[in-house]
Amino acid sequence: MEIKEEGASEEGQHFLPTAQASDPGDCQFTSIQKTPNEPQLEFILACKDLVAPVRDRKLNTLVQISVIHPVEQSLTRYSSTEIVEGTRDPLFLTGVTFPSEYPIYEETKIKLTVYDVKDKSHDTVRTSVLPEHKDSPPEIGRSFLGYASFKVGELLKSKEQLLVLSLRTSDGGKVVGTIEVSVVKMGEIEDGEADHITTDIQGQKCALVCECTAPESVSGKDNLPFLNSVLKNPVCKLYRFPTSDNKWMRIREQMSESILSFHIPKELISLHIKEDLCRNQEIKELGELSPHWDNLRKNVLTHCDQMVNMYQDILTELSKETGSSFKSSSSKGDKTLEFVPINLHLQRMQVHSPHLKDALYDVITVGAPAAHFQGFKNGGLRKLLHRFETERRNTGYQFIYYSPENTAKAKEVLSNINQLQPLIATHADLLLNSASQHSPDSLKNSLKMLSEKTELFVHAFKDQLVRSALLALYTARPGGILKKPPSPKSSTEESSPQDQPPLMRGQDSIPHHSDYDEEEWDRVWANVGKSLNCIIAMVDKLIERDGGSEGSGGNNDGEKEPSLADAIPSHPREDWYEQLYPLILTLKDCMGEVVNRAKQSLTFVLLQELAYSLPQCLMLTLRRDVVFSQALAGLVCGFIIKLQTSLYDPGFLRQLHTVGLIVQYEGLLSTYSDEIGMLEDMAVGISDLKKVAFKIIEAKSNDVLPVITGRREHYVVEVKLPARMFESLPLQIKEGQLLHVYPVLFNVGINEQQTLAERFGDVSLQESINQENFELLQEYYKIFMEKMPPDYISHFQEQNDLKALLENLLQNIQSKKRKNVEIMWLAATICRKLNGIRFTCCKSAKDRTSMSVTLEQCSILRDEHQLHKDFFIRALDCMRREGCRIENVLKNIKCRKYAFNMLQLMAFPKYYRPPEGTYGKADT
């Protein structure tokens, strides 16, 4: 049968089309017995006695792995090893792994083709289609040596699952050496036998022993189906590296997309639409306004309706992306995808070493949250928000200025009103239901809940802002006289002006009006409390006459006003409902009047914010929503993964509900040209994540995707866990305690643009961000040390000298050293030791991010797992040349080249430079 070769533009990592995978003919093939959610097959390679085409030539060899699919008998290039230089007996550190979803069977044939690489600068894994058994053209810098093939079943059924195959030339005749194929099972003891293999690396002999001890489970495998509902399209790579005592450790590298890339933005946009529609309706219901304010309202509503329509259009377009879980870097300027994070992936390294427990290291890689479609001509959010607020503070007489704090407070009170009013109505109805049943215990419990919610309701209106807003709205009514331009006055609601210039204090400018009766609001507001007291007194009286227990079990205010109880006439027992009903009706009426007045006044506050500088203020809101959406999608992904991997760690769970989690972002953006605006966007987007809290709930169905509730000032992300996992949580978390995160950002530009910024430009933005976020990190550490139990802290301090690390980080931040990447290394180390969530970001999370995460992985292997010092650079090159990150580049731009040139790399720190042959001109 003729075998045809398919192009490998995806290098075999994107699985075959569904139609092929589900072909009815598949049933005749034998599936591989496998552990759920684990790779189906992993093996390592070594060659011996290779014959050079030219006498005395030292070979630089690599092996290309191809798969012959039994259904169509087509051949697909799958992966390659690294290049091993200067030996005829190469032992390859890069293995081969087939993920759990890959369509592979015992009948599947694997072809191994060995090449001699003559020029690494021109070599990369080919993506073009070449005829089978044809030597590569000489211009790509390598020549064909030999090939061998085997069926997967032959390997699995062989003795010790090891095959030694002869390598033959293209005509199948001459033997040019042998190749060993050995199955790898992460974490299994290899029958206690050692496989001594000698390799010649850079002229040094190194005897390597391949043996591993039995591992402990890295993460509960029961949790993996839950994680797989969030992660998609895994790319897996396998390595073996020597330790300092010449034993093998094995590393599995994995990169996965997340369906949260699209799910979270859609959830968030839906909330924005709901919130904005509600706000627009409240503005319409402000009542009659003077011509000046009415014209402003009409203008605001016109623009706000346009904004809602735009959000609805974006949501419609996103809803069409039903199968998407990834936004490529080349789509970062696409308007319909601007809410979606760029190139979001989980980058995971699993380590199995001879003497240490198995370990997982996760980093979320994502493009810097930024509004690429809107551009950066005028800067990013940090600059734009500051400029907008300064101009609004100095606006003319036609507006009333409210500080950002008071505008946020107005939104908070409005949100509380909308939540509490229906709750109070529900508890009031439950109280009446208890009364109709003549149940004293039920009556007391219902009263307690009603009292608690009503007290929260009354407390929401204690803020002076409500009073000032009522006055402002009064002057905006027809006949309201605004005698002079608003002038700042001191008021108790003002925030501290210490962060503002003396001449630009953020004081609200509220008009005065002599005819306004301020006491009227006090009377309306107080009526709610009085109505509640009457209900409490009545319940006390009813229970007392019924011979119930003393006291209402609710609020003690009834004891302070005995006259209320004394004034209640005696009634028969069967009249409980009739006696409480008019009091409940009065409470609802009083509450309705308060809600109506407060809603209108606080909505008028929001009108001031919107009325100024239309449509610029709405465009700022859009920009902030876009950036926040990208940041939140990454955060939710990181939180779920961290929860899954640490679910059975009591210390982590205690930290989660006692302190919260540190979320550390590593930025690699320069402070030059457009990337300044990106960094300004990113800084605000990450800071806004403080508004997010998490709540873990039990999943009631197979749908475990997170749900978001709330509004722009405060969001709650509900993470669903299957019942078995949910039961393992501490009581505080199971009862719904909100879990908080502490986001911090440290940025160090590393490219040639940063060189220009350091020599001819300004790096103050980077310095300010790093200093501000160090203070946030230090504050988290202080809370951590105060709130965690003493026995935990004692053990923690024995294992980690975090105080010294923080001091070192501060010194590096203050040192003003150019491209001081030690800032990032220290911040990442501190984050890991604090059980935090790690992020690495550059413009598109493709090139600079790849250099950073691979360096971090190899540094961890060296510092934590005793990677042999002579193999550090080689391990780094393996991961960059044949690892997950080069696959990431391919996914994004359909080209297996990091987008660097030689001139750019001269400006990069030494260990951030990719190996020769992996970079060059690429369309990004």
Curated annotation (Swiss-Prot):
Domain of life: Eukaryota
GO cellular component, one term: cytoplasm
Kinase keyword on record: no
Keyword Lipid metabolism: yes
Keyword vocabulary terms for this entry: Hydrolase, Lipid metabolism
Protein name: Type II inositol 3,4-bisphosphate 4-phosphatase
Gene3D superfamilies for the chain: 6.10.250.230, C2 domain
Organism: Pongo abelii
Alphabetical list of SUPFAM superfamilies matching this protein: C2 domain (Calcium/lipid-binding domain, CaLB)
Gene: INPP4B
EC numbers, comma separated: 3.1.3.66
